[in-house]
UniProtKB/Swiss-Prot annotation:
The lineage of its organism: Eukaryota, Viridiplantae, Streptophyta, Embryophyta, Tracheophyta. A motif (Gate loop) lies at residues 89-93. The record marks P92, T156 as: Involved in interactions with PP2Cs. InterPro entries: Plant_def-hormone_signal, Polyketide_cyclase/dehydratase, START-like_dom_sf. It is found in: Cytoplasm; Nucleus; Cell membrane. The gene is PYL7. GO terms for molecular function: abscisic acid binding; protein homodimerization activity; protein phosphatase inhibitor activity; signaling receptor activity. This is Abscisic acid receptor PYL7. Residues 29-180 are annotated as: START-like. One of its GO terms (cellular component) is plasma membrane.
Length: 211
């Protein structure tokens, strides 16, 4: 696509269009007739590097996913490796076997396939991306998570999408809470470090003056 002429508004609209198209390409799923797909977006008031540091930990999803009690990874957490996830009681599942399909630290992309477990999420594939975003004048993050999954026999596409979306919404809400709490701690620690350094500088000057 080529842009010719136009004012600043046209440029902004073109930039937004290119961004939207880029995001759609990253979240492109091949959805068969017996499957459903959807994409969810969450805005988080924490810098992208902090959010990504939580998301990328394929070996420790329980850091922010509230329904996971334990995770075991066979080997190093690299593309192609598997993890065994134990699900907390109260959900219609106890275990899930998942494979890491994508892990891009530059583009901030995480892709996962579920290949086994005692649940009904057959042929489940998800892609999660994080993107820098200004929120209320501060550096924040936009998180996008998309999925495709088989519709179980006896269920509708709407019912299946609603169930999976509910789980993802809970995960993203928890991700926001954990990220924003860590961001607040970073700010508090930075202020404390600055204050301590300032106090030390003043004490040093006071001592030198008395001498």
């Amino acid at each position: 696509m080529e842009m010719i002429g136009g004012d600043d508004t046209d440029t902004e609209m073109y930039g937004a269009l290119v961004t939207a198209q880029s995001l759609r390409l990253r979240h492109l799923h091949h959805c068969r007739e017996n499957q459903c797909t959807s994409v969810l977006v969450k805005y988080i008031q924490a810098p992208v590097h902090l959010v990504w540091s939580l998301v990328r930990r394929f070996d420790q999803p329980q850091k922010y996913k509230p329904f996971i009690s334990r995770c075991t990874v066979n080997g190093d957490p690299e593309i192609g490796c598997l993890r065994e996830v134990n699900v907390k009681s109260g959900l219609p599942a106890t275990t899930s076997t998942e494979r890491l399909e994508q892990l891009d630290d530059e583009e901030h992309i995480l892709g996962i396939n579920i290949i086994g477990g005692d649940h009904r999420l057959k042929n489940y594939s998800s892609i999660l991306t994080v993107h820098p975003e200004m929120i209320d004048g501060r550096s924040g993050t936009m998180v996008m998570e998309s999925f495709v999954v088989d519709v179980p026999q006896g269920n509708t596409k709407d019912d299946t999408c609603y169930f999976v979306e509910s789980l993802i919404k809970c995960n993203l809400k928890s991700l926001a809470c954990v990220s924003e709490r860590l961001a607040a701690q970073d700010i508090t620690n930075s202020i404390a470090t600055f204050c301590n350094a300032s106090n030390g500088y003043r004490e040093k000057n006071h001592t030198e003056t008395n001498l």
